[in-house]
Amino acid sequence: MITQLEKDLQLMKMHNINAIRTSHYPNAPIFYKLCDRYGFYVIDEADLEMHGSVSVNNTAHWDWSDYSGIALVASNKMFYKGILDREKICLARDINRPCVIMWSMGNESGNGHNLTKAAEWIKAFDNTRLLHYESVHNQGDTTDAPYDVVSRMYPSPEDWSKFPENKKEKRPFILCEYCHAMGNGPGDLEDYHKVFHSSPRFCGGFMQLLMKSLICRLCLTACGTFQRLMPA
């Protein structure tokens, strides 16, 4: 019996989709077995996301001008063991899966000493795979960071096209998220794909999302009426 998951993977292959990022947590074990079978490249992402952990240093709210405002947990030593545990769980379970070509530290968790130490542990534990983390980029020059790719999410095609101009940076570039849209969109795929083909340094990207945004549900409101929702 073919499961819905397998049908989704078959559909992706039919449309020349060859890589999956398990945002933002490891997937069910059967997923990796199917990816082995169908030949998908997988970025296996640990269950680590800390959007709400703003620091109390004058950033009690989300501030796009200071992305480090969500870096309290990433920096405070009392959280290091918990962060490392989540990384270890991901690696220990999936290290023998051929489809996994890259580990991802997590998603949008700021950056700090805890993440750097955990990344160093991962590199020592498994030096056969690449390591990914997007949220390090707010720290300025990251050419000496323990990550094997330069990762971004949602830059404009114009800004993205300028990345190879940085002569200090020798790593490949990857869009870990782009073109997140619901309904009749997005309309900028061609612009991004032109950039992908403009330099061998661009590895491609991961659209957010494939199926989930198309699920509609009904829920009962406080007034007793039904309202159709489209969850992100």
Regions found by a protein language model. Give the residues of each.
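Extended substrate-binding grooves/exosites of carbohydrate-active enzymes
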Residues: 1-232
